[in-house]
Amino acid sequence: MWQDVVDLKDFYDREIGRTARHLLRARIRALWPDLTGQRLLGLGYATPYLRQFLGEAERVAAVMPAAQGVMPWPREGLGMTTLADETELPFPDNSIDRVLLVHALESSEHPSDMLGEVWRVLGGGGRLMLVVPNRRSLWSHLERTPFGHGQPFTQGQVTRLLRSRGFTPLNTDRALLFWPFSWRTWLRAAPGWERIGRRWFTPFAGVIVIEAMKQLYGAQPAKPVKRRRA
């Protein structure tokens, strides 16, 4: 079930959300250090992680699923968000270079179809980055944050799902190794706990970050089934 966009925004407006965004942005940037000239699409509630690419990527757009709702973004300039069904993206085939999924895979009732649609809009060799709640983490079991909603995953589950829809996993990282508590002193120490956790406790990180590439050859993913709208 998709979370309400207002609840997602409220989380990222709080100190714990700002801390999570700062730490997770760093892992995303480490995997995608330069998107100059790339066409970037965020799907789900990815806008907290897209701003760092404004002015660098050739084009940035954000799709928020209809069941979630939409928020205008960015605050300044022309709006870059649109509302759409996650299995019927409003983009031509092979028109996107990079896709970032955040608060998406775990919420969709049709995750395989959604990945099939991402495969369709990505160009040859295009890259997909997934941020999903880690089933083994405390974050995935506490509903006080968005990462505690929906279906959490293991790395193996995500890898198999990606391969079944025509993607080759390339890189894996972890983030959010501090516990999801809102105590101010705890959050101030979060960067330090993140460094310690990355050394010793990565299996229990809050989220799994996986980069994958669109595979052009071999088995092609089935076309998503179009469902009649009510």
Where in the sequence are the language-model features?
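Class I SAM-dependent methyltransferase Rossmann-like catalytic core
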Residues: 1-34
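A short glycine-rich, Lys/Arg-flanked "PGG" loop and its adjoining helix->strand segment in the class I
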Residues: 112-127
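C-terminal lobe and adjacent flexible extensions of AdoMet/dcAdoMet transferase-like proteins
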Residues: 194-230
